[in-house]
């Protein structure tokens, strides 16, 4: 019977140990496991939320970059258009100024040509009178000279 009493003693000790473990040891272990599961689940949920937020932020950033690129292209196009307008205005002003300068040049050349032509007429008339005086051998009076010069200038 010794064997049976030992077996019963061991059964009672095991039952007490099991009851003690279930009552005092098992709840803190289960609580720690549940807390760990909860913290892991929360961490996974936070990671998923952060991944979702990162994806949303990335999408928003890409949209903003696209908008900025479009706006930059619009600004560049506007600047190019304005540059072309200014260039056209400057070219038109330059053409107008060029035409005005050429016209002034022609007017100055024409005035100079007329002045030189008039001087040439007077000199030709004076030379003609001088030649005529030498041929005739006498001097025509001053009033007659001026009269003859005026007539020659008018004829030329």
UniProtKB/Swiss-Prot annotation:
<keyword id="KW-0375">Hydrogen ion transport</keyword>
<keyword id="KW-0406">Ion transport</keyword>
<keyword id="KW-0066">ATP synthesis</keyword>
<protein>
    <recommendedName>
        <fullName>ATP synthase subunit b</fullName>
    </recommendedName>
</protein>
<comment type="function">
    <text>Component of the F(0) channel, it forms part of the peripheral stalk, linking F(1) to F(0).</text>
</comment>
<comment type="function">
    <text>F(1)F(0) ATP synthase produces ATP from ADP in the presence of a proton or sodium gradient. F-type ATPases consist of two structural domains, F(1) containing the extramembraneous catalytic core and F(0) containing the membrane proton channel, linked together by a central stalk and a peripheral stalk. During catalysis, ATP synthesis in the catalytic domain of F(1) is coupled via a rotary mechanism of the central stalk subunits to proton translocation.</text>
</comment>
<dbReference type="GO" id="GO:0045259">
    <property type="term" value="C:proton-transporting ATP synthase complex"/>
</dbReference>
<comment type="similarity">
    <text>Belongs to the ATPase B chain family.</text>
</comment>
<keyword id="KW-0812">Transmembrane</keyword>
<keyword id="KW-0138">CF(0)</keyword>
<dbReference type="GO" id="GO:0005886">
    <property type="term" value="C:plasma membrane"/>
</dbReference>
<dbReference type="InterPro" id="IPR028987">
    <property type="entry name" value="ATP_synth_B-like_membr_sf"/>
</dbReference>
<keyword id="KW-1003">Cell membrane</keyword>
<dbReference type="InterPro" id="IPR050059">
    <property type="entry name" value="ATP_synthase_B_chain"/>
</dbReference>
<dbReference type="InterPro" id="IPR005864">
    <property type="entry name" value="ATP_synth_F0_bsu_bac"/>
</dbReference>
<feature type="transmembrane region" description="Helical">
    <location>
        <begin position="7"/>
        <end position="29"/>
    </location>
</feature>
<dbReference type="InterPro" id="IPR002146">
    <property type="entry name" value="ATP_synth_b/b'su_bac/chlpt"/>
</dbReference>
<keyword id="KW-1133">Transmembrane helix</keyword>
<dbReference type="GO" id="GO:0046961">
    <property type="term" value="F:proton-transporting ATPase activity, rotational mechanism"/>
</dbReference>
<dbReference type="Pfam" id="PF00430">
    <property type="entry name" value="ATP-synt_B"/>
</dbReference>
<comment type="subunit">
    <text>F-type ATPases have 2 components, F(1) - the catalytic core - and F(0) - the membrane proton channel. F(1) has five subunits: alpha(3), beta(3), gamma(1), delta(1), epsilon(1). F(0) has three main subunits: a(1), b(2) and c(10-14). The alpha and beta chains form an alternating ring which encloses part of the gamma chain. F(1) is attached to F(0) by a central stalk formed by the gamma and epsilon chains, while a peripheral stalk is formed by the delta and b chains.</text>
</comment>
<keyword id="KW-0472">Membrane</keyword>
<keyword id="KW-0997">Cell inner membrane</keyword>
<dbReference type="GO" id="GO:0046933">
    <property type="term" value="F:proton-transporting ATP synthase activity, rotational mechanism"/>
</dbReference>
<keyword id="KW-0813">Transport</keyword>
């Amino acid at each position: 019977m010794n064997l049976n009493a030992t077996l019963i003693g061991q059964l009672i000790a095991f039952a007490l140990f099991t009851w003690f473990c279930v009552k005092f040891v098992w709840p803190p272990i289960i609580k720690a496991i549940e807390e760990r599961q909860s913290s892991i689940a929360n961490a996974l949920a936070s990671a998923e939320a952060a991944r979702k937020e990162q994806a949303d932020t990335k999408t928003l950033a890409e949209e903003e970059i696209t908008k900025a690129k479009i706006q930059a292209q619009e600004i560049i196009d506007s600047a190019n258009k304005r540059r072309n307008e200014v260039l056209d205005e400057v070219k038109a002003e330059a053409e107008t100024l060029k035409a005005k300068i050429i016209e002034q040049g022609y007017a100055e050349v024409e005035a100079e040509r007329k002045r030189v032509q008039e001087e040439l007429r007077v000199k030709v008339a004076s030379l003609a009178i001088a030649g005529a005086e030498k041929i005739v051998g006498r001097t025509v009076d001053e009033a007659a000279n001026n009269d003859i010069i005026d007539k020659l200038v008018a004829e030329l």
